[in-house]
């Protein structure tokens, strides 16, 4: 499904929170949306593998990487796992790498930057916790919509039709 965050903001202005414009699109989908699962991890993506092995249909993984752009939390292997398990998208408050491969995949990926250095894989972090970045607080179960213009968040699903 295609999402237009500008149109959604016009219609649902009182019902959405707008994430500050810190992110760029690195995935093969120009827009994506779904119910979110939150993760907090710093320069370590081991926990992301466990979560992305789950069925992701209709879901978006929101990763609070502390805003670090020193190590990439998502690479092509991890993104392929997300595609295989039907995740709608990933929002990374941090960095990604292997961007040429990422843009070929049928998934939305919004991140702050790209860097060639990968993350540790120790599995350090926590999931289903409140995370805050970009001027917005994210809770697992909220609904996120993203496109090349921006990212918006709503407690309830928005009627797109």
From Swiss-Prot:
Principal place of residence: cytoplasm
Matching CDD domains: RraA_family
Pfam families the record matches: RraA-like
GO MF assignments: endoribonuclease inhibitor activity; enzyme binding
Alphabetic keyword roster: Cytoplasm
Gene Ontology CC annotations of this record: cytosol
Domain of life: Bacteria
Protein's UniProt keywords contain Cytoplasm: yes
Cellular localization per UniProt: Cytoplasm
GO BP terms: negative regulation of RNA catabolic process
InterPro entries: RraA, RraA/RraA-like, RraA/RraA-like_sf, RraA_gpbac
Disulfide cysteine pairs (residue numbers): none
Record family assignment: Belongs to the RraA family.
Subunit text: Homotrimer. Binds to both RNA-binding sites in the C-terminal region of Rne and to RhlB.
Task of the protein: Globally modulates RNA abundance by binding to RNase E (Rne) and regulating its endonucleolytic activity. Can modulate Rne action in a substrate-dependent manner by altering the composition of the degradosome. Modulates RNA-binding and helicase activities of the degradosome.
Name of the featured protein: Regulator of ribonuclease activity A
Gene: rraA
């Amino acid at each position: 499904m295609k999402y237009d965050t500008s149109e959604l903001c016009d219609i649902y202005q009182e019902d959405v929170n707008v994430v500050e414009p810190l992110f760029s699109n690195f995935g093969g989908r120009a827009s994506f949306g779904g119910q979110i699962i939150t993760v907090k991890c710093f320069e370590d993506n081991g926990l992301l593998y466990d979560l992305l092995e789950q069925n992701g249909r209709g879901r978006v993984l929101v990763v609070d990487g502390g805003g670090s752009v020193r190590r990439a939390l998502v690479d092509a292997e991890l993104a392929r796992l997300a595609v295989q398990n039907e995740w709608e998208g990933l929002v990374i408050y941090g960095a990604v790498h292997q961007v040429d491969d990422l843009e070929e995949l049928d998934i939305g990926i919004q991140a702050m930057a790209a860097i060639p250095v990968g993350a540790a894989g120790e599995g350090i972090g926590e999931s289903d916790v409140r995370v805050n970045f970009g001027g917005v607080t994210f809770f697992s179960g909220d609904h996120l919509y993203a496109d090349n213009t921006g990212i918006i968040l709503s407690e309830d699903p928005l009627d797109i039709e």
